[in-house]
């Protein structure tokens, strides 16, 4: 009986430990990595770059970098004034989203480049590329460069290049040179193969035979 009891206890202990670990994992809140964003005041006279992983952290850092002492503020999207007041909505936004902080009594207004939809001119361009250089820290070497490409006014792709230190700049430069060398090598291989194929086809074509029809007439 004691042996069976000891065996049952030894079997239950690992199961209990696994249950506690599973409960601990499920109850542990999901920690999101810090992402880059842009923030500005109500009249867009001051803009800053901020790294934040949550809505509360973004608001706190925005108040610090823009030197806002008012406790009651509202965070909205700069492009259309949509209020961002929930963590779920904040996590769905893309990196480098532009925000605007509004103090009590302030209202969102469209920027100088904003044109109502009914008055927007028709654009015939296929693609548009924009560059945005900003700094997350005054001590950064060059800052961060955001490259955004928009195709047919429908699809957009953005890439963030961080040049916060000289080593990072050198690393990105070497990476670009390596990629350019690979592309150049592939182009030369394809061009050489194509030229050899054209020359081979030219050599295989038979030379035209002289006509002897007039000799026997």
From Swiss-Prot:
Region (Amphipathic helix): 163-180
Domain of life of the organism encoding this protein: Eukaryota
Major place of residence: other
Compartment(s) where it occurs, according to its Swiss-Prot or TrEMBL record: Lipid droplet; Nucleus
Descriptive protein name: Lipid transferase CIDEA
Family: Belongs to the CIDE family.
UniProt-reported outcome of changing residue 24 to A: Substantial reduction in nuclear localization and loss of XDH induction
Gene Ontology cellular-component annotations: cytoplasm; cytosol; lipid droplet; mitochondrial envelope; mitochondrion; nucleus
Oligomer status and interactors: Homodimer. Interacts with CIDEC. Directly interacts with CEBPB. Interacts with isoform CLSTN3beta of CLSTN3; inhibiting the lipid transferase activity of CIDEA.
Annotated tissue distribution: Highly expressed in brown adipose tissue and, at lower levels, in white adipose tissue (at protein level). Undetectable in undifferentiated preadipocytes. Expressed in mammary gland during pregnancy and lactation, in epithelial cells, but not in the surrounding adipose tissue. Secreted into milk via milk fat globules.
Task performed by this protein: Lipid transferase that promotes unilocular lipid droplet formation by mediating lipid droplet fusion. Lipid droplet fusion promotes their enlargement, restricting lipolysis and favoring lipid storage. Localizes on the lipid droplet surface, at focal contact sites between lipid droplets, and mediates atypical lipid droplet fusion by promoting directional net neutral lipid transfer from the smaller to larger lipid droplets. The transfer direction may be driven by the internal pressure difference between the contacting lipid droplet pair and occurs at a lower rate than that promoted by CIDEC.
Record's catalysed reaction(s): a triacyl-sn-glycerol(in) = a triacyl-sn-glycerol(out)
Stated induction or repression of this protein's expression: Up-regulated under conditions that enhance triacylglycerol deposition, including rosiglitazone treatment and high-fat diet. This up-regulation is mediated by PPARG.
Result of altering residue 23 to R: Increased nuclear localization
Result of knocking out the encoding gene: Mutant animals appear normal and fertile and produce the expected Mendelian ratio of heterozygous and homozygous descendents. They are lean and resistant to diet-induced obesity and diabetes. They exhibit higher metabolic rate, lipolysis in brown adipose tissue and core body temperature when subjected to cold treatment. Mutant females are unable to properly feed their pups who die within 3 days postpartum due to severely reduced milk lipids.
Pfam families: CIDE-N
Entry text on domains: The amphipathic helix mediates embedding into the lipid droplet phospholipid monolayer, promoting phosphatidic acid-binding, thereby facilitating triacylglycerol transfer.
Entry keywords, A to Z: Activator, Apoptosis, Lipid droplet, Nucleus, Transcription, Transcription regulation
SUPFAM superfamilies found in the cross-reference section: CAD & PB1 domains
GO terms for biological process, alphabetical: apoptotic process; cellular response to cold; fat cell differentiation; lipid droplet fusion; lipid metabolic process; lipid storage; negative regulation of cold-induced thermogenesis; negative regulation of execution phase of apoptosis
């Amino acid at each position: 009986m004691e042996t069976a009891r000891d065996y049952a206890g030894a079997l239950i202990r690992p199961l209990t430990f696994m249950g506690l670990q599973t409960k601990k994992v499920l109850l542990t809140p999901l920690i999101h990595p810090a992402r880059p964003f842009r923030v500005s005041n109500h009249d867009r006279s001051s803009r800053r770059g901020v790294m934040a992983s949550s809505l509360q952290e973004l608001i706190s850092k925005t108040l610090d970098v823009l030197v806002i002492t008012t406790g009651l503020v509202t965070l909205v999207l700069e492009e259309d004034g949509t209020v961002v007041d929930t963590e779920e909505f904040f996590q769905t936004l893309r990196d480098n989203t532009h925000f605007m902080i509004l103090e009590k009594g302030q209202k969102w207004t469209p920027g100088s480049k904003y044109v109502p939809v009914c008055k927007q001119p028709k654009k015939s361009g296929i693609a548009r590329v924009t560059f945005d250089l900003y700094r997350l820290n005054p001590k950064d070497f060059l800052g961060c460069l955001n490259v955004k490409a928009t195709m047919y006014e429908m699809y957009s792709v953005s890439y963030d290049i961080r040049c916060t230190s000289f080593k990072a700049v050198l690393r990105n430069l070497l990476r670009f040179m390596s990629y350019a060398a690979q592309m150049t090598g592939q182009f030369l291989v394809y061009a050489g193969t194509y030229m050899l194929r054209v020359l081979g086809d030219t050599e295989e074509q038979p030379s035209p035979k002289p006509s002897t029809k007039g000799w026997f007439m």
